[in-house]
Amino acid sequence: MVLIRVLANLLILQLSYAQKSSELVIGGVECDINEHRFLAAFFKYQPWTFQCAGTLIHEQWVLGAAHCYKRGLNIYLGMHNQSIQFDDEQRRYAIEEHYYRCDEKLTKWEKDVMLLKLNKPVRNSTHIAPLSLPSSPPSIGSFCRVMGWGIMSSTKDILPDVPHCANIKLVNYTECVAPYPNIPVTTRLWCAGVLEGGIDTCHQDSGGPLICDGQFQGIVAFGRYPCAQPRVPALYTKVSNYTDWIQNIIAGKTTTACPP
């Protein structure tokens, strides 16, 4: 399910890791229909294909991963089965894209955040409701939930019609240093997974939420391929590092969005 990684460019660079912008949750199970009311699905045209996931955090704003952006993205809210449309399913497109450019010292890996303003507000319904930004950080060792329409196998690009969910665990960021020698792994990123292997996010899970202790703590960012390898957790962007920036953008303070 959450095996989201953008492999193409990384394979060209002959790197052993990949962005999760096209992965599914491996080792997961179909999410409960009422478990993911905030989950957004990004589709692109030509050809019409599922791209990534995102999280509805406000009636008119979706938070995702910057590496997922494509021109002309269609954003679906309230979707569960891609083949069966709910009556309250809503389709939107972005009229504004915002990227974190506040700290030039940060690498692209540390600011893989994208905030999209929808063309019109989304109506709350049976299958749609926003997810709040975190009020406090989780502890290392916390159990977290990941979800997405990413690939379900670490060896075959098999995409599901329905989102899959899985439980993983926050581990010390040092666990991600060795598996990702080409990424500056810092405390600005969450390192999470199942060290025994078998459960992970993967291709096209990118941009989806990492929910720990009921709070939206991370955004699916990067991981090694094949996904779900033992002692190879994945990396997630820490939402708490960007809450002030997000709130300022939503409030219309685009010229003063960066924290002092």
From Swiss-Prot:
Its EC number is 3.4.21.-. It is found in: Secreted. InterPro entries: Peptidase_S1_PA, Peptidase_S1_PA_chymotrypsin, Peptidase_S1A, Trypsin_dom. Glycans are attached at residues 81, 124, 172, 241. GO terms for biological process: proteolysis. It is an enzyme of class 3 (hydrolase). GO terms for cellular component: extracellular region; secretory granule. Residues 1-18 form the signal peptide. The active site is at 67 (charge relay system), 112 (charge relay system), 206 (charge relay system). Residues 19-24 form a propeptide. Disulfide bonds join 31-165, 52-68, 102-258, 144-212, 176-191, 202-227. GO terms for molecular function: serine-type endopeptidase activity; toxin activity. Residues 25-251 form the Peptidase S1 domain. Keywords: Disulfide bond, Glycoprotein, Hemostasis impairing toxin, Hydrolase, Protease, Secreted, Serine protease, Signal, Toxin, Zymogen. Expressed by the venom gland. Belongs to the peptidase S1 family. Snake venom subfamily. Snake venom serine protease that may act in the hemostasis system of the prey. Monomer. This is Snake venom serine protease Dav-X. The lineage of its organism: Eukaryota, Metazoa, Chordata, Craniata, Vertebrata.
